[in-house]
Amino acid sequence: MMIGLYLFLNLAVLWIVARASAANGLRLALMLLLAGFVVGSANSLIEALFFHVLRARDLVAAALPAAIVFAVLAPIAVLIAGRWRRGAAASDAGRGGFTPLTLLGVIAAYELLYWSAGTLVFPYIAHFYEARSLPPVYEVAAVQIVRSLVFVGAVYPLLRNGLRSAPIVLALVYSIIGGVAPLLPDNPYMPPDIRFYHGIEVTVSNFIFGLVVGWLFAWRPRRPVAAQA
């Protein structure tokens, strides 16, 4: 049942992204595959490896099922969204972008959300990590810089090609594909109670992070209007 819900949630969000995107066809399917796999699996595996929840030799076995799932779901989402053939482009196609300042904002937002959510949930999951040697705080913070930029990179092609309502769409991508969905099925690495609390943690924080990323992509500082003589 949880596998079915996992597949349904991922397909539903990919369909929403496909409907909001200005791209179409195979190009759109590949962008959905990239976003789905990286957000829904690869970026989480980075942290699982870092916290010794997963061993390096288990990475391929852990990543392969998600790669297959998104390779199948991505073209299906494009097809049922009616975007396999050329359609109307999104009205905000090509607008927006990131600057060094906005990327710093992305990193700062992710760090703030990560540590805030983690601090609130840690008392409920501390027993799971007692037997593991946790890395120093500065190393954890450094890894989150990388992960925040990986999150952005995964959806950047979609943003550059035009994505209507980008903040809310990214909030759904990060919170469902990268939050609640992958924690639904049983897995040999994390027991149900730990997945439950982590699910609350990442779903809420990732939703807010998606709003921030979408807003910062479109944000431009206002230029002063020259006074007329």
Each language-model region and where it sits:
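Juxtamembrane/disordered regions of integral membrane proteins
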Residues: 1-229
